[in-house]
Amino acid sequence: MATPHINAEMGDFADVVLMPGDPLRAKHIAETFLEDVREVNNVRGMLGFTGTYKGRKISVMGHGMGIPSCSIYTKELITDFGVKKIIRVGSCGAVRMDVKLRDVVIGMGACTDSKVNRMRFKDHDFAAIADFGMVRNAVDAAKALGVDARVGNIFSADLFYSPDGGEMFDVMEKYGILGVEMEAAGIYGVAAEFGAKALTICTVSDHIRTHEQTSAAERQTTFNDMIKIALESVLLGDKE
């Protein structure tokens, strides 16, 4: 039945949901890559759709910006609608010079300055990691598509406009962080808490060092390699 944030019924969502932050990107994914699409959520404009990809039922829905927003939607999808796998498909900023604009980054783990996972884990550090099988399938899908995806740690920040002055970016670069975004650590924590599986795949939308960036329109429509990797990885997962 419907929740406070999702006006769908059990069965409206597939067991796998792709989740961009932007609901308009969710609409673009559904209209571009899925067949037999129907809208399954529109509460607060957070659009959700279900359709098929090469005959496989798949859903896509926005999760908003930041860990609090994405945690609400992922929790409800898992506990109220039977979703088993979440794949975040979003954008990230690069801090390393060897990571380039539009590179695809697969988030094997997610560091964070948020305290949400410590709240879940009785004030202990929680290793927020993606499901290994989903990582492997995404890597294999990327190779099959000829995409040189990067795999490693990303950083989920609570603040988009940080007062830090850039010092933390130096630390991230030293520790090999591939990209900075705002949701993965929270999604991995929710998945662990409620027995689901999760993965984050990002496209580098801007570079913190060089100040290169993609436009909002590009972020909505041109990150197709990332979406193809996510969709093909679902099909690979079905063969396991």
From Swiss-Prot:
Active site (UniProt): D206
Residues given in the record as phosphate binding sites: G21, R25, R44, R88, V89, G90, S91
PROSITE patterns xref list: PNP_UDP_1
E.C. number: 2.4.2.1
GO CC list: cytosol
Top-tier EC class: transferase
Record bears the keyword Cytoplasm: no
UniProt-annotated binding residues for a purine D-ribonucleoside: H5, E181, M182, E183, S205, D206
Gene Ontology terms: biological process: purine nucleoside catabolic process
Reactions the enzyme catalyzes: a purine D-ribonucleoside + phosphate = a purine nucleobase + alpha-D-ribose 1-phosphate; a purine 2'-deoxy-D-ribonucleoside + phosphate = a purine nucleobase + 2-deoxy-alpha-D-ribose 1-phosphate
Key words of the record: Glycosyltransferase, Transferase
Annotated site location: Important for catalytic activity: R219
One Pfam family cited in the UniProt record for this chain: PNP_UDP_1
GO MF entry, a single one: purine-nucleoside phosphorylase activity
Gene3D superfamilies: Nucleoside phosphorylase domain (3.40.50.1580)
UniProt record similarity statement: Belongs to the PNP/UDP phosphorylase family.
Job description of the protein: Catalyzes the reversible phosphorolytic breakdown of the N-glycosidic bond in the beta-(deoxy)ribonucleoside molecules, with the formation of the corresponding free purine bases and pentose-1-phosphate.
Assembly behavior: Homohexamer; trimer of homodimers.
Record protein name field: Purine nucleoside phosphorylase DeoD-type
UniProt organism field: Enterobacter sp. (strain 638)
Gene that specifies this protein: deoD
